[in-house]
Regions:
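Face-selective signature of the C-terminal outer-membrane beta-barrel domain
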Residues: 281-440, 461-465, 517-518, 522-530, ...
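Short, acidic, small-residue-rich periplasmic hinge/interaction motif at the N-terminus
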Residues: 20-58, 97
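Transmembrane beta-barrel wall of Gram-negative outer-membrane proteins
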Residues: 171-202, 207-244, 282-283, 287-299, ...
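Extracytoplasmic beta-strand/coil segments of soluble accessory domains associated
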Residues: 66-108, 130
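Membrane-embedded beta-barrel scaffold of Gram-negative outer-membrane proteins
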Residues: 294, 300-306, 463, 469-475, ...
Length: 737
């Protein structure tokens, strides 16, 4: 039991080998075939780690999936509201969310336009999953936007043999409450099964207006026998959160680190007020129908039809006028309330086939997808137009986007000798994008283009003496700009009078070399990576008006580093795990283009820019050092105590290595204590989670802006940061049978 508790608490933190955390041993089962075609296996020369269902369920109940994965090697996670519930995001090796390919049961969850995954839209996802594989580097071929530094491969496909039920209730700081319930029939003798789960989470959040009211539901109805599997899966997410994406500046941070300017305005008497519906709201449905067929013992075919429907909006108060509003008869000024909505449909057909012999595994697949999204703007109220104006009949703007993709790959793993595996993976991606109509500042966003990509991968892995493994691999990847990248580039070109509005797709060569040793009490691994970029789409440090990072092409850059992992288990009741990453994240001959404004008083863009040259510069939000250590004790049967610490080095908020525009290094520690009681029927678990136990006052993410004032040539800048909560607590009670 002690060994099981140690594994459940720690395997999520440390990949047992460089290639993976150990064999899953289920790739031939029908209930896992739907995801195995895009996952790396034990001998695949890809850097990855595995996280099981038990490990995911052992994290704090308020943590989103990025926060649950934050102790993985080279992973950094942050929450906008300062806690684990609500808007969260993560990076891997400094690679941002829009460059991380995320799949659920082999189907991409990345939004087709922004390429992001908005984890808040699927709350409590970790409680619904049977396993997660985190690949670092270009990884294996997968559907959807190509991985450009990391992949997160998630699975709900795990059929339990017997009926089950569970309830988890959590309560903690900032009036945070979570409830998760799950039940399933298990597989009947006729092969039928049904699983259902639902969750609810509410919190006031740490900073003002960081409240969250989120819910999710999951259902799977299926049938399987020895040769066939048919499964219908539904995943639902609903979120209502306060807007927090602006962060706060340093002066505000020093005065009140819980301050949030969102929705702030002055009334007629000069008093500070806050709009009470400064919110972000979104509902999403995912529906998957999968059929899998096993022909003989060697050939397997799986096909999935997937549909995502999303509908939501954000609403906020803008205490300043703006002109040129599309859909209105006249310009107007003064305070106003806007609502910007998104309505989208995403349809995917994915089909894979796998053939396996004793020495050869051959996998091929095709994915076809289409996305149709409408971006709709409405003015809810304006003090210029008054309360009696017919706002419903006047649409502010309508912008449409259609994106189609075709994706085909073939992958082979061949073992010419028992101690060696050769790997090759060839992928084609074709992408077609059409945008039409203006957005909130009346800039026309009519744009149409297509991209064709070829992404080859190859590698070798070696095994000897039963405890040593090594691998080497090379891969080429391409990735197209996202909608937000194109939109902001068009706007900047429009405002500055430039003609070229195109952004180039980025290209990467990823070289990986790894070694791992696994002993009875000690395990250790080292992985070296060289991620070489051309035409890299890199953040400038600025954010759009809705919190998207604005990017630009840079000719040449690289991320080069070493990832070290180790574990030591001197006794059955004690284990230590650690990982450490050292990296260089550089841009060659970086040039910064700063937009000029006329005067301090007018602050009107002149269409001119000032150029600064920095030589080889460090990429923003890419710490050169990060690491983790965790100790786990099992003092007596069915009890566990663990303490962990995460260190993240200094991060710059832009690409200029300016100390005043940077996030200082920080260290944060967490403690958990748990015990499980056996009952007449089922088990009762109690757990206490103490986050940030040393009460460190730190911030983990941010952005910056800058302009040149032409009247005196001065550079004026500012930053926005996201304070994280001081010491906070969560209690969880779990009942399972």
């Amino acid at each position: 039991m002690r060994g099981f508790l140690l594994s459940a608490a720690l395997a999520a933190l440390f990949p047992g080998t460089v290639q993976g955390a150990g064999p899953e041993g289920i790739v031939d089962k029908l209930d896992s075939a739907v995801v195995s075609t895009s996952r790396a296996g034990e001998s695949t020369p890809v850097t990855y780690s595995m996280v099981s269902r038990e490990q995911l369920q052992s994290v704090g109940p308020s943590n989103s999936l990025p926060m649950a994965l934050s102790l993985q090697p080279s992973v950094m996670a942050v929450n906008e509201g300062g806690t684990g519930l609500g808007y969260s995001k993560m990076t891997v090796r400094g690679v941002k969310g829009s460059q991380i390919n995320v799949t659920l049961n082999g189907i991409t969850l990345n939004d087709a336009e922004s390429q992001e995954v908005f984890w808040v839209n699927i709350p409590a996802l970790s409680s619904l999953l049977s396993s997660v594989q985190v690949q670092r580097g270009l990884g294996t071929s997968a559907s959807g936007p190509g991985a450009f530094g990391a992949s997160i491969n998630m699975s709900t496909a795990s059929v339990r043999p017997e009926a089950y039920a569970s309830v988890d209730v959590g309560y903690g700081s900032y009036d945070t409450f979570t409830l998760t319930a799950a039940a399933g029939t298990g597989k009947s003798r006729h092969g039928l099964y049904f699983d259902f789960a639902c969750s609810k989470g509410v919190t006031d959040g740490y900073i003002r207006n960081a409240y969250a009211d989120v819910a999710s539901a999951y259902a799977a109805l299926g049938w399987m026998n020895d040769r066939n599997s048919l499964r219908l899966t539904w995943l639902y997410g609903d979120q209502h959160t306060g807007i927090t994406w602006n962060g706060i500046d340093l002066h505000q941070y020093e005065a009140d680190r819980r301050y949030n300017p969102a929705g702030e305005y002055y009334d007629a008497f000069g008093n500070v007020r806050y709009y009470d519906n400064e919110t972000d709201n979104y509902t999403q449905h995912h529906l998957q129908l999968n059929y899998t067929r096993l022909f003989g013992e060697r050939l397997l075919w799986t096909t999935t039809l997937h549909w995502t429907y999303g509908d939501g909006y954000y609403e906020n108060y803008r205490p300043a006028g703006i002109s040129g509003y599309y859909g209105f008869d006249q310009d107007f000024s003064g305070d106003f309330i806007i609502r910007e909505a998104l309505l989208n449909n995403y349809l995917v057909l994915n089909s894979d086939v796998r053939y396996r012999t004793d020495a050869l595994t051959l996998t091929a697949g095709v994915t076809l997808s289409g996305y149709d999204g409408d971006h709709i703007g409405k003015v809810q109220w304006s003090d210029f137009l008054g309360d009696d104006y017919d706002y419903a009949s006047h649409e502010w703007y309508l912008n449409t986007g259609i994106k189609k993709e075709s994706n085909a790959f073939i992958r082979a793993e061949y073992e010419p000798f028992r101690w060696m595996t050769a790997y090759a993976d060839l992928q084609y991606r074709g992408v077609w994008l059409d945008m039409a109509g203006p957005e909130d500042d009346n800039v026309p966003l009519d744009y149409s283009t297509d991209w064709q990509f070829f992404n080859p991968r190859a590698g070798l892995s070696f095994r000897w003496s039963g405890s040593h493994k090594a691998f080497m691999s090379a891969a080429v990847g391409h990735r197209e700009p996202g909608r937000a990248d194109i939109k902001e580039n068009i706007k900047n070109a429009w405002l500055s009078g430039h003609q070229d509005v195109s952004l180039k797709p980025e290209r990467m060569l990823d070289l990986e070399f790894g070694y791992a040793f696994t002993g009875e009490k000690v395990s250790a691994s080292a992985n070296f990576y060289l991620m070489e970029y051309w035409d890299m789409l890199l953040e400038t440090g600025k954010l759009s008006n809705v919190g998207y990072a604005i990017k630009e092409n840079v000719d040449r850059g690289w991320r080069r580093g070493v990832e070290l992992c180790a574990s030591y288990e001197p006794f059955k009741w004690l284990r230590a795990d650690a990982n450490l990453t050292f990296s260089l994240n550089k841009i060659r001959d970086y040039k910064e283009y700063v937009q000029n404004v006329d005067t301090y008083e007018n602050w009107t863009m002149t269409g001119r820019t000032t150029i600064y040259e920095y030589g080889n510069s460090t990429m923003l939000m890419s710490p050169s050092v990060m690491g983790m250590m965790r100790l786990t004790f099992v003092p007596w049967k069915k009890s566990a105590v663990s303490i962990d610490g995460k260190y993240v080095g200094r991060q710059y908020l832009d690409n200029t290595m300016t100390l005043s525009r940077s996030i200082p290094s920080y260290f944060v520690s967490n403690l958990s204590v748990s015990h499980t009681f056996d009952l007449n029927k089922g088990t009762l678990g109690l757990a206490l989670y103490v986050n940030n136990i040393f009460n460190n006052m730190y911030y983990a993410d941010g952005w910056c802006w800058k302009n040149i004032i032409e009247e005196d040539g001065a550079l004026v800048d500012g930053i926005g940061i996201y304070p994280q909560a001081p010491v906070n607590y969560m209690l969880k009670a779990s009942y399972r049978f």
